[in-house]
């Protein structure tokens, strides 16, 4: 077998008949499979042991040779080689065909490769191949030319003879007619009888003339066909062909079926044809040039690849190994077989029948029919259903052909090569494990025992609990007591991987240290639920076991959950307190006025109370029950750092040191909370809303090592759960309070609604106006009920606590629960003007319930559709970007992109850019950030973290130049400096990081949160596409719905306002030609934008527009942006538009992820003029390859190729990849493989997908070449331990040999006397 680690490219080509015969171990001659009595394979059949190898290890068919000692012998009785049975998975056979057949992929694919090569229309080709027309294969022009006059004379003689014969016959008939008429006249017959005789005579003469004319026409037809006869000419009329064959057979050859195609290919001169086509392309125009270009693609492919086009017509068909198309016996003695066996049997049956017919010398028509059937059976074997009706099995099910085995989700690529089942894995339901540390998970004992079985067995033998592996296995199966102790020992420090489907981003698989737990459910740490998107309502998770030391090291260092706190999409922590924990910490840090033991200032006759000398004293007071944790107190602190402003005031420039005392006015709860934070973190004296907690953890992640952050979030989790329990937050019906003012509020609005109804009935309002008015009224009513609700609820109401703390829910839900549901929409997305006045607490009326179901059902249907769409989008994104890997540290480019940090207002103040988090943050500076005085604030090459951004803003810098993957010049992949900081680690990205896949996951994972809706914007006719459809539209580079024109030039606008359309003319500033935009629908409305004077208003006559400016509402077409403004602008446009959709849903994704995808969309150049290069005009070439080839040509002082950048959608870009393995496993498998085989494509195995398919380590992360051949050396200590010299003491040697030091003994001065 091939060792996958030792080849680095994979080439695919066309197999010739010779190749097929070379691969084969023998010819399959019979359609039989196995003998149904003996169940042994039939000789020479589809499962023959002689061809494919023995069915039992080391045993021949007849049983003469058994056992391994006869290895390699070929039995002289049955001819079977004695070897392993697994060779039946790799040995191929073949079928020798009695007549050649064409390969359906090359004839029927679009475009038809055979048709392009031979310059035949696919329809004509089909007629030839399926025996409906003859084709002329060759003409002896010279001989025909020499003998043309003689042949013409012969033809003239023949024609003369026909004419003479005709004339003679007519003459004789005319005379007979005359005689008959004369006889009738003599008899005095009636005029009627005479007329009948004359008519019949004339009719016969007419028939004579017609017959002769037909004969003459036939001769004319034969002659004209013969004189114009040329190769590749079709003759559909069989009689005409027979005549030509009889008369002029020596001047030409012709045939039908695949044989004729084979002959045409044999005589085809590829080089000459390529030269002719290149000439046509250079000098031709229009359709002719286009056709020549398409044909040259196929011809040049054969010319350059050295493939023989003969491979498109087969003389032999390979038979794949029998184990890959098995036949198995079912219960009840019936057999189940792979469809391929049926298809092969059809081929063999027809082939054998054809051989017999040829031997019998059957008539041509019968032989041709059999050949056609053979062609059809081979077509069905290769690609069933591609032409005509598919061959069906029992129950009218189309049989699965070789092509179907590769295609689609169930095909070989996606089912078995990209998605394999894994050993050492298990799955179970998950429950919460609040007692766990962040890096731990609870593993059920039984599951752990099964997973670690081999490890446990080995350890049992090592510890002498069992004599051998077999008895150890028995011990494990019987679950003896010793087994559990050994299991504890084995799982220590051996991480396991937990995965929850769907794995939408890389945090869907994380490593944990297992802790054994009773029961059968896996226990999961509550803080990782966010990353897995898990909850405990019955979710299941899978466990996988990393086996090798390397795998364990990767799991522990790279995948351990405590090292994966940050989101790879935004760089913000995902392991945040949620739900109960938020409620607990919120409760703990709330300050309640005048609570038990609160601080009281000193009165005239009373000392101040609620003052404590240390947190310990305060805790003691709380334990005694005299102080509430939520009461305000004064406390002296020595171990907590004061907030910045207090620190400056109290401790000056030296700053606070641990042990320095200061007094805080706070609550005991807040002191307890601050004790959870790392030492030296400034005291936070606030109520802990979820957002505040998030900000703190964010800050910790920026400033402290991951291990500290992990410990802190664990402490926050424990404290959160503890205080959530103490707080007694529960929800009961009694907590849902309906505001008493609700009825009077609704009554007042009901009156207003009635007034509107009356106006409508009087005709003062039309239907739409009435609806709008009602919707406004009821929106106000709902808001007012909400306000009344808010005022009526006490602050410590559990529902309000849950909502206010940010734990879950929002105020709208509270209002629905206790106030009123308000307006709902119908399926079209319009508000129904009757509101739902009841709350869920009171219960809905039947009508209210009914109108509420509209929205609810639409929501559910939407979610289901969205999930599938979002998954498909992720799949396409991953496919387009899977080979973007960080390849080097720095590409040394000077280029970069400008990003905004802030906007300067009119009064000179700076307003921080709201999206700085996702644009400038975590990038590398491409040029020094300089303030107005010219001082460098942040130097080039620095990483922009929060402190650096703050420094720039403080220095008044509004924009900086940063490195970006869009301007990176690394050939394949990107460089670390252009990519910048890895969002997941907070450090510069490592070489080998698969940033493409991280980008695809970051964009795809929140896809399910995006809406499916198209938004109705008041009065706009065209819907504005939003949500997921908009993201797809952008990444597929489609022309958007309701596309808006953009200005091609800078100039003044002349606006003509028609009845239904606008006409915009731009008069260019440079005096060039005017640009006219005609028929712009008024429903789309003109664009509002900022004018030169700073005002915002609609585009109007006489305005000045810049190049690329949008003129109407809607979305610009990215292809136009590329044409008008160039690649840089279209990149910025796409990134901005995608971000707009995600920001609308409150999803934070860093720009760099979108840039990685956009870079892949703009990787190619379309060739306009090939110059002196090998490129074909119109072909799409990778930019790096294009530039390299041009440099080479210019160096040889040739003419470089001219090309223009092209924007490709992600599906098209995935299929245009250089890796045929990756493209074939993505979509359109047969088309990709056909194309790759003709071009003899070579896959360099650069991407991840190709390597997964062939089973190599992926070239990313620890799989990149620099880590491939690392040899691990033991340390000195390990070496010393391994090679210690045993102490043999005195029982082995005499005392003279020294005290077991291992020192050499000088034998010369050693006495041998004692031993003699």
From Swiss-Prot:
Zn(2+) 2 binds at residues 891, 968, 975, 978. SUPFAM superfamilies: beta and beta-prime subunits of DNA dependent RNA-polymerase. Disulfide bonds: none annotated. InterPro entries: DNA-dir_RpoC_beta_prime, DNA-dir_RpoC_beta_prime_bact, RNA_pol_asu, RNA_pol_N, RNA_pol_Rpb1_1, RNA_pol_Rpb1_3, RNA_pol_Rpb1_3_sf, RNA_pol_Rpb1_4. Pfam families: RNA_pol_Rpb1_1, RNA_pol_Rpb1_2, RNA_pol_Rpb1_3, RNA_pol_Rpb1_4, RNA_pol_Rpb1_5. One of its GO terms (cellular component) is DNA-directed RNA polymerase complex. One of its GO terms (molecular function) is magnesium ion binding. Coiled coil: none annotated. It is an enzyme of class 2 (transferase). Binds 1 Mg(2+) ion per subunit. It catalyses: RNA(n) + a ribonucleoside 5'-triphosphate = RNA(n+1) + diphosphate. The keyword Zinc applies. Its cofactor is Mg(2+); Zn(2+). Keywords: DNA-directed RNA polymerase, Magnesium, Metal-binding, Nucleotidyltransferase, Transcription, Transferase, Zinc. One of its GO terms (biological process) is DNA-templated transcription. Mg(2+) binds at residues 535, 537, 539. Belongs to the RNA polymerase beta' chain family. The RNAP catalytic core consists of 2 alpha, 1 beta, 1 beta' and 1 omega subunit. When a sigma factor is associated with the core the holoenzyme is formed, which can initiate transcription. DNA-dependent RNA polymerase catalyzes the transcription of DNA into RNA using the four ribonucleoside triphosphates as substrates. PANTHER family: DNA-DIRECTED RNA POLYMERASE (PTHR19376), DNA-DIRECTED RNA POLYMERASE SUBUNIT BETA (PTHR19376:SF54). This is DNA-directed RNA polymerase subunit beta'. The lineage of its organism: Bacteria, Bacillati, Actinomycetota, Actinomycetes, Mycobacteriales.
């Amino acid at each position: 077998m091939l060792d996958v680690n030792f080849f680095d490219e994979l080439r695919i080509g066309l197999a010739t008949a010779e190749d097929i015969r070379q691969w084969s171990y023998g010819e399959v001659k019979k359609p039989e499979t196995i003998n149904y009595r003996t169940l042994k394979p039939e000789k020479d059949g589809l499962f023959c042991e002689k061809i494919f190898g023995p069915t039992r290890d080391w045993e021949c068919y007849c049983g003469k040779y058994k056992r391994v000692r006869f290895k390699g012998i070929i039995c002289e009785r049955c001819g079977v080689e004695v070897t392993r049975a697994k060779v039946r998975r790799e040995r191929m056979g073949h079928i020798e065909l009695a007549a050649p057949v064409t390969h359906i992929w090359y004839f029927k694919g679009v475009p038809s490769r055979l048709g392009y090569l031979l310059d035949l229309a696919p329809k004509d080709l089909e007629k030839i191949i399926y025996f409906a027309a003859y084709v002329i294969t060759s003409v002896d022009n010279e001989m025909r030319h020499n003998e043309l006059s003689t042949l013409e004379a012969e033809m003239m003689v023949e024609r003369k003879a026909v004419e003479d014969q005709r004339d003679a016959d007519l003459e004789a008939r005319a005379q007979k007619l005359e005689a008959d008429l004369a006889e009738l006249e003599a008899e005095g017959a009636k005029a009627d009888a005479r007329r009948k005789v004359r008519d019949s005579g004339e009719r016969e003469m007419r028939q004579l003339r017609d017959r002769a004319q037909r004969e003459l026409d036939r001769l004319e037809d034969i002659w004209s066909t013969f004189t114009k006869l040329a190769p590749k000419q079709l003759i559909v009329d069989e009689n005409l062909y027979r005549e030509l064959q009889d008369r002029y057979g020596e001047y030409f050859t012709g045939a039908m079926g695949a044989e004729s195609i084979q002959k045409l290919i044999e005589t085809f001169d590829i080089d000459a044809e390529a030269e002719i086509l290149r000439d046509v392309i250079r000098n031709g125009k229009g359709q002719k040039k286009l056709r020549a270009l398409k044909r040259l693609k196929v011809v040049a492919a054969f010319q350059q690849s050295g493939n023989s086009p003969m491979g498109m017509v087969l003389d032999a068909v390979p038979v794949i190994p029998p184990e890959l198309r098995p036949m198995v016996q079912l219960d009840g003695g019936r057999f189940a077989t792979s469809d391929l066996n049926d298809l092969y049997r059809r081929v063999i049956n027809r082939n054998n029948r054809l051989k017999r017919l040829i031997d019998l010398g059957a008539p041509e028509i019968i032989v041709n029919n059999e050949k056609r059937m053979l062609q059809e059976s081979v077509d069905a074997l290769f690609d069933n259903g591609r032409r005509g009706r598919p061959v069906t099995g029992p129950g009218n099910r189309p049989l699965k052909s070789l092509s179907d085995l590769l295609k689609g989700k169930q095909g070989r690529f996606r089912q078995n090569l990209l998605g394999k089942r894994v050993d050492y894995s298990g799955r179970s339901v998950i429950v919460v494990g609040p007692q766990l540390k962040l890096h731990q998970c609870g593993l059920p004992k039984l599951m752990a025992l099964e997973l670690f079985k081999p490890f446990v067995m080995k350890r049992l033998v090592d510890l002498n609990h069992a004599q051998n592996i077999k008895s150890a296995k028995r011990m494990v199966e019987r679950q003896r007591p010793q087994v559990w102790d050994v299991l504890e020992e084995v799982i220590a420090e051996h991480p396991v991987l937990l995965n929850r489907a769907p794995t939408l981003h890389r945090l869907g698989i994380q490593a944990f240290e297992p802790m054994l737990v009773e029961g059968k459910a896996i226990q999961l740490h509550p803080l990782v639920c966010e990353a897995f998107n898990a909850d405990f309502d019955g979710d299941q998770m899978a466990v996988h076991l990393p086996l090798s030391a390397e795998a364990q090291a990767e799991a522990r260092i790279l995948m351990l959950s405590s090292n994966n706190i940050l989101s790879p999409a935004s760089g913000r922590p995902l392991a945040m307190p949620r739900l109960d924990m938020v409620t607990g910490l919120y409760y703990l840090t709330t300050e309640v006025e005048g609570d038990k033991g609160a601080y009281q200032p000193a009165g005239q006759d009373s000392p101040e109370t609620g003052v404590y000398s240390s947190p310990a004293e305060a805790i003691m007071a709380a334990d005694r029950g005299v102080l509430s944790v939520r009461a305000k107190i004064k406390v002296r602190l020595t171990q907590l750092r004061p907030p910045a402003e207090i620190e400056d005031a109290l401790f000056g420039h030296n700053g606070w040191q641990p042990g320095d005392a200061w007094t805080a006015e706070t609550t005991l709860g807040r002191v307890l909370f601050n004790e959870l934070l790392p030492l030296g973190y400034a005291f936070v004296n606030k109520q802990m809303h979820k957002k505040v907690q998030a900000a703190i953890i964010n800050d910790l992640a920026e400033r402290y090592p991951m291990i500290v952050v992990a410990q802190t979030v664990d402490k926050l989790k424990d404290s959160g759960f503890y205080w959530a329990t103490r707080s007694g937050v529960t929800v009961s019906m009694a907590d849902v309070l309906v505001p008493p003012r609700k009825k009077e509020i609704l009554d007042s609005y009901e009156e207003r609604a009635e007034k509107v109804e009356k106006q409508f009935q009087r005709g003062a309002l039309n239907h739409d106006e009435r609806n709008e008015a009602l919707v406004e009224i009821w929106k106000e009513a709902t808001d007012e009920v909400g306000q009344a609700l808010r005022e009526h609820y006490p602050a410590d109401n559990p529902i309000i606590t849950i909502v206010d703390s940010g734990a879950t829910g929002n105020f709208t839900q509270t209002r629905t629960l206790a106030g009123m549901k308000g307006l709902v929409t119908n399926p079209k997305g319009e508000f129904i003007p009757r509101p739902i006045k009841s709350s869920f607490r009171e219960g809905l009326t039947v009508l209210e319930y009914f109108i509420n179901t509209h929205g609810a059902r639409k929501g559910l249907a939407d979610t289901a559709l969205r999930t599938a769409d979002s998954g498909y989008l992720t799949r396409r994104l991953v496919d387009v970007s899977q080979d973007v890997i960080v390849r080097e540290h720095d590409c040394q480019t000077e280029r970069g992109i400008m990003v905004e940090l802030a906007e300067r207002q009119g009064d000179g103040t700076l307003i921080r850019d709201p999206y700085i988090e996702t644009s400038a943050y975590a990038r590398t500076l491409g040029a020094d950030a300089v303030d107005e005085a010219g001082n460098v604030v942040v130097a080039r090459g620095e990483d922009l973290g929060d402190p650096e951004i703050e420094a720039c803003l403080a220095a008044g810098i509004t924009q900086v130049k940063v490195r970006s993957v869009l301007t990176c010049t690394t050939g394949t992949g990107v460089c670390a400096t252009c990519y910048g900081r890895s969002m997941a680690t907070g450090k510069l990205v490592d070489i080998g990081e698969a940033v493409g896949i991280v980008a695809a996951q970051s964009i795809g994972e929140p896809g399910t949160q995006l809406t499916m809706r198209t938004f109705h914007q008041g009065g706009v006719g065209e819907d504005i596409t939003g949500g997921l459809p908009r993201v797809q539209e952008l990444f597929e580079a489609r022309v958007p719905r309701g596309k808006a024109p953009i200005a091609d030039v800078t100039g003044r606008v002349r606006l003509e306002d028609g009845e239904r359309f606008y006409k915009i003319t731009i008069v260019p500033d440079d005096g060039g030609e005017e640009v006219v935009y005609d028929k712009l629908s008024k429903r789309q409305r003109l664009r509002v934008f900022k004018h030169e004077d700073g005002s915002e208003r609609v585009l109007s006559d006489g305005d000045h527009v810049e190049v690329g400016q949008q003129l109407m509402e809607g979305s610009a077409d990215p292809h136009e942006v590329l044409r008008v403004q160039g690649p840089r602008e279209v990149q910025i446009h796409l990134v901005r538009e995608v971000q707009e959709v995600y920001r609308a849903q409150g999803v934070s994704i860093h720009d760099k992820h979108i840039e990685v995808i956009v870079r892949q969309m703009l990787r190619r150049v379309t060739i306009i003029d090939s110059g002196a290069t090998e490129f074909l005009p119109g072909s799409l070439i990778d930019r790096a390859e294009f530039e390299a080839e041009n440099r080479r040509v210019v160096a040889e002082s040739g003419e470089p190729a001219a090309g223009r950048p092209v924007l490709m959608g992600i599906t098209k870009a995935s299929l245009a990849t250089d890796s045929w393995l990756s493209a074939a496993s993505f979509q359109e498998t047969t088309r990709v493989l056909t194309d790759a085989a003709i071009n003899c494509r070579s896959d360099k195995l650069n991407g991840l997908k190709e390597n997964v398919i062939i089973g190599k380590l992926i070239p990313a992360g620890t799989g990149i070449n620099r880590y491939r051949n690392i040899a691990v050396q033991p340390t000195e200590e390990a070496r010393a331990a391994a090679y210690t010299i045993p102490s043999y003491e005195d029982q082995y040697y005499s005392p003279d040999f020294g005290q077991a030091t291992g020192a050499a003994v000088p034998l010369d001065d050693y006495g041998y006397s004692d031993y003699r």
